[in-house]
Amino acid sequence: GDIDALLDLEARSFETDRLTRRNFQYLLTRAHAACLLAEDAQGNLLGYVLALFRRGTSLARIYSLAVSAKARGQGIGQALLLAAERTAIEEHAWLMRLEVRPDNQSAIRLYEAAGYRPFGRYLDYYEDHSEAVRYQKRLRPDVVPPETRVPYYSQTTDFTCGPAALMMAMKALTPETELG
């Protein structure tokens, strides 16, 4: 029922990188995620947003957001985005991130109007090799991110960076640690 409606909306909304039945089943049952739906009075699916949460971090991610063509322009995308942000705050996230195609101007307008700001790009991100613009928004302006400065320590072996990474982490946590 619901997965069929989600798959139908997915097929009508995206030309590439569509979620499959297996993707939806995993995300709805096993992942640390929330799938929020917008429906009309008859129970027809108008849109959905899929948000992912990472245990042990303050990051959340909009994985997918789609609104049916007939329901666009009615504020449904904005309402879904706001609902995902509220859910992320309940999950103790204070930063929401997402990726969007640079040619998806309607989505970019939605995200920028909601306070999302670009902070980077992924090259060759989508199936068709187009890039993605990365956006983020601080959901909790009252939460100040930790100022952890990690000093650089050059790798001393040619086979792994593990020891150097461990040294940098130790120095960041205990500044009096001597590197070298």
Language-model-detected regions and their locations in the chain:
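Acetyl-CoA-dependent GNAT
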Residues: 3-72, 78-83, 87, 91, ...
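Well-formed, non-transmembrane alpha-helical positions, independent of function
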Residues: 5, 109-110
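Conserved catalytic-core motifs of GNAT/GCN5-like acyltransferases
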Residues: 22, 97-100, 112, 117-134
